[in-house]
Design a protein with these regions (language model features):
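Short helix-loop-beta junction
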Residues: 41-43, 88-89
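Short loop/helix-cap segments at secondary-structure boundaries that form the rim of catalytic
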Residues: 36-42, 57-59, 102
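Conserved beta-strand scaffold positions in the cores of enzyme catalytic domains, especially
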Residues: 10, 27, 44-46, 92-94
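Short amphipathic alpha-helix with an adjacent loop that forms part of the alpha/beta core around
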Residues: 18, 53-62
Length: 113
């Protein structure tokens, strides 16, 4: 919801999962480190939504970035995605359903450090 209001592209958990089968995707979890350790989208980075910079992201500004947080009411992912757009990244999406939506869709996860 917040992604759309901020003019960002939104993607569903199933849509992200399909994309991950076909092309390189940088999934970015902006939840707490503890939450990231418990369950995350496979291969997802864990970044502080307010404290990351370009060195934490791929060098290629055309890379596909997908930000997510906990659930549709969370504003951290849209805010972090907007920040990436301001840094010049053009292919930025938000998985608005968050990790909750990913888990509810019974999609594969990773856990641990």
């Amino acid at each position: 919801m917040f992604a759309w209001l901020m003019g960002l592209k939104s993607i569903s958990p199933a849509g992200l999962h399909r994309l991950m089968q076909d092309k390189p995707v940088t999934a970015i979890d902006v939840n707490s480190r503890q939450s990231w350790v418990q369950a995350r989208v496979p291969g997802a980075l864990n970044l502080d939504p307010a404290g990351y910079d370009e060195k934490n992201l791929p060098a290629d500004k055309d890379s596909l970035l997908v930000f997510y947080c906990s659930n549709p009411l969370c504003r951290k992912a849209p805010n972090a995605a907007r920040r990436a757009k301001q840094m010049g990244y053009g292919n930025v999406h938000v998985m608005s359903a968050g990790i909750t939506g990913w888990l509810n869709a019974k999609l594969p996860t990773e856990s641990g450090e």
